[in-house]
Amino acid sequence: MAKASETKTVTVEQIGSPIRRPGDQRATLVGLGLNKRHRRSTLQDTPAVRGMIAKVQHLVRVVADE
């Protein structure tokens, strides 16, 4: 099992507006910790988070993979 200091993270930035988007996409942005354009959120790099990023890939961009 990986130690806490070895946990990989991914930083995402919201580049698109949630206005006129389906509710599930808005909820996904909230789940990623984003709500306004150009805000950044650093999250643990897990399959669930990667799936959320893929779902709203037109609204976010990956800034850094660590």
Curated annotation (Swiss-Prot):
<dbReference type="InterPro" id="IPR036919">
    <property type="entry name" value="Ribo_uL30_ferredoxin-like_sf"/>
</dbReference>
<keyword id="KW-0687">Ribonucleoprotein</keyword>
<dbReference type="InterPro" id="IPR016082">
    <property type="entry name" value="Ribosomal_uL30_ferredoxin-like"/>
</dbReference>
<dbReference type="Pfam" id="PF00327">
    <property type="entry name" value="Ribosomal_L30"/>
</dbReference>
<comment type="subunit">
    <text>Part of the 50S ribosomal subunit.</text>
</comment>
<keyword id="KW-0689">Ribosomal protein</keyword>
<dbReference type="InterPro" id="IPR005996">
    <property type="entry name" value="Ribosomal_uL30_bac-type"/>
</dbReference>
<dbReference type="GO" id="GO:0022625">
    <property type="term" value="C:cytosolic large ribosomal subunit"/>
</dbReference>
<protein>
    <recommendedName>
        <fullName>Large ribosomal subunit protein uL30</fullName>
    </recommendedName>
</protein>
<comment type="similarity">
    <text>Belongs to the universal ribosomal protein uL30 family.</text>
</comment>
<dbReference type="GO" id="GO:0003735">
    <property type="term" value="F:structural constituent of ribosome"/>
</dbReference>
<dbReference type="GO" id="GO:0006412">
    <property type="term" value="P:translation"/>
</dbReference>
